[in-house]
């Protein structure tokens, strides 16, 4: 059985792990990339990586995100040097993000970089970014537009949301792999993820 799951965030990632236990490599997760951000010299893809960590059994289940038993030594040392310290990345998380940055800087696609990461972590399912073109979710609050991660982490997600926009969505296209996953699926599932910032960018 082939299942295509649209997901982003912890809820969708947990469902993906449960589905993989049932359908194995018949599962394809189409993950939101509107949260993606470049920081500390690396390319961070939070939702695809969160899904990957749940699927590989490496996630910190207490927090619901990140890698269990992983430290922040590299991040903390970089912060001592004056690097931005608002977006924390653990050691193994940094490794994935550094690999992705280097892979894409050499001309590789985001889709292929994620495939290498999932394969390296022994994931049976397929994890596809929603597009290889950059899409960035931006939030308007207190009269200013800012990236989603800045809003959630720096602002704490506490100020009233006045607007949401997806920068780059008009240029973004689905990949051949994504189209194949949808067209060949016996079942298409929209995961229990935030409908505006996780599912919305995928459907847009």
Regions found by a protein language model. Name each.
Residues 10-11, 30, 193-197:
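Short glycine-rich anion-binding loops that position phosphate/pyrophosphate groups of nucleotides
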Residues 11-16, 37-40:
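Short N-terminal binding/cap micro-motifs at the start of the first secondary-structure element
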Residues 167-173:
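Short gly/ser/thr-rich secondary-structure transition/capping motifs
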Residues 185:
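An anion/phosphate-binding loop that grips the pyrophosphate of nucleotide cofactors and donors
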Residues 21, 32-166:
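Electropositive, gly/pro-rich neighborhoods at or near active sites that engage anionic ligands
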Residues 14-27:
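A short, Lys/Arg-enriched amphipathic alpha-helix followed by its capping loop at the start of a domain
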Residues 202-204:
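Charged helix-capping and loop-helix junction motifs
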Residues 1-4:
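Extreme N-terminal starter segment of soluble prokaryotic enzymes
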């Amino acid at each position: 059985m082939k299942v295509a799951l649209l997901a982003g965030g912890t809820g969708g990632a947990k469902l993906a792990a449960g589905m993989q236990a049932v359908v194995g490599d018949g599962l394809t997760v189409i993950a939101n990339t509107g949260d993606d951000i470049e920081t500390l010299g690396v390319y961070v893809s939070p939702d695809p990586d969160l899904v990957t960590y749940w699927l590989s059994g490496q996630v910190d289940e207490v927090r619901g995100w990140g890698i269990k038993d992983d430290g922040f030594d590299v991040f903390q040392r970089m912060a001592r040097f004056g690097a931005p310290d608002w977006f924390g990345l653990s050691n193994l998380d940094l490794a994935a993000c550094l690999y992705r940055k280097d892979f894409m800087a050499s001309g590789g696609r985001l889709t292929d970089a994620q495939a290498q990461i999932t394969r390296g972590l022994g994931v049976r399912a397929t994890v596809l970014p929603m597009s290889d073109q950059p899409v960035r979710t931006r939030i308007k609050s207190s009269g200013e537009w800012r990236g989603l991660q800045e809003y959630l982490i720096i602002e704490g997600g506490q100020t009233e949301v006045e607007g949401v926009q997806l920068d780059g969505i008009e240029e973004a296209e689905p990949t051949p792999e994504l189209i194949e996953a949808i067209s060949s699926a016996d079942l298409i599932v929209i995961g229990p993820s935030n409908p505006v910032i996780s599912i919305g960018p995928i459907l847009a």
